[in-house]
Amino acid sequence: MGGVRINTELLNGNTAINSNDMEAQGIFANIDHRDKKSNTNLLVGYRHLNIEGGARWFSLKAAAIGKEITKVPSAPEASKNYGFDGLAKESEGYIIALNHEQKMNADWKWFLNAGMNSNKLQRNIIGASSNFVIINDKGDVSNNLMSTQTVTKNYYAQLGINGNIKTGAVNHDVTLALDKAWHSIEGAKNMYNNGSMGSVSGNIYSGLQGNNVWYPSIETGLSSKDQYWGISLADTVKYKKAQLLLGVHKHNASVDSYNKITGRVTQTVGSDALCPTYGFVYQPDEHTSLYASHSENFDKGTIVASKYANAGEVLNPAKTKQNEIGFKYANAGFLTSLGIFNIKQANNIEVYKGSTYLQQDGEQEYQGIELSVNGKLADKWNFMGGLMYLDATQNKTQNGTNDGKTVNGAAKWNAVAVLEYNPDEKFSIVGRAMYTGKADIYNEQLQTPSYMTYDLGVNYKTAFNKTPVTLTAMCYNLTDKNYWTAYGNNLILSSPRTLMLSATFDI
């Protein structure tokens, strides 16, 4: 028993942003085969994407904070094109992934997961540091342009066994796996971001223009390589109303940073770590589940991106630790979940010292509570909602300078509500409201405003020549709200009101 599913993509035209052209071609094939003893899935795909204009990324000039910049300028018109003639991003890539399971007997099986993907950013003509720099409260923009290429390749392989062991009334689901991953990046030997290929100037409210723009040819060189080896063991123990997960992962990693021009290694960072994972679930009755969990992950070391003054530097490896407790309650067609979590990870932040550097300074701690409710309100009416409070702070920073300050770009409040109406089996209407609270940036010196957006859509099920089809019309950002989304210290401009039509054929 098996099947083949093919998804194709062809885009060519303007988006909801003025003079923003997008062209894309893609094809993906998912092939699967199942029999009594095995299960195999193969995914292969290719995609090419070309975007002209329509830049959304901005930043504030760090040296002007508290001087020419005393506030975050109000978001400009989202439908305007804040690019210039020649601004472009073009990429192509492919993916191959294989998953196979083979039964050895009634209780044991072995499995193989392997894959690779490659992506080449062929053209990337944008403001230096990959965004446009706002220099004052009026929204004026001034910075150099840059042109770059990036080639990324990833390889992964995992081999393991999984089986069930019964010891009296206790059931063990045991998994042992070995895995290895390879990753490499090539970058432009010269990005021409020193003004030699031109500059961009203007204002976010009236538009931007490129000045003396020149498009150089780009040659790439090896920027970084890393390798990762790991072994993991996990045991899920089930006994009556209780379930216990015990797991551990041991890894070794090596990260090499290269001089793209000479091809020589400039820095090597090796690491190894033991990361435990454990969790507990207890179901006192058919409606209620109580849970608690702890997990640890290890970052092998962040390689500083080319837009920073310390590009190519490898930041120290660091662990991310997460703890969570909560409960789930299901009754009368509703599922309610409440979780309290704590996450600690390395604090990789932007630091301005004449130029912008990426540095590791202490840790980030995320503490929060998340509530979600979904279910059937009444006949033909469904509801889903969620609310999260997040307290994200910086700790253990150098000399305590930023201790207790909010992590840049982290909003304290987020909420979503979705309402669906199904007048009959063929037709449905869905509405969604999303709220994002205000967020501090630049270590609480500035703040982005809160915003709320609304989406509205309809679905209709029909048939063309006896082939089932679902027609969908969706309007995103229904009220055409203009807003900034904070991402670290960067500002991402919202997308304008966008109408999307689609048809899904069940062949």
Regions found by a protein language model. Give the residues of each.
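Structural signature of Gram-negative outer-membrane beta-barrels, strongest in the C-terminal barrel
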Residues: T152-N154, T167-E186, T220-Q345, K376, ...
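Transmembrane beta-barrel wall of Gram-negative outer-membrane proteins
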Residues: M1-L60, A88-N99
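Repeated loop/turn-to-beta-strand initiation elements of outer-membrane beta-barrel proteins
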Residues: G2-V4, K37-L42, D107-W110, A169, ...
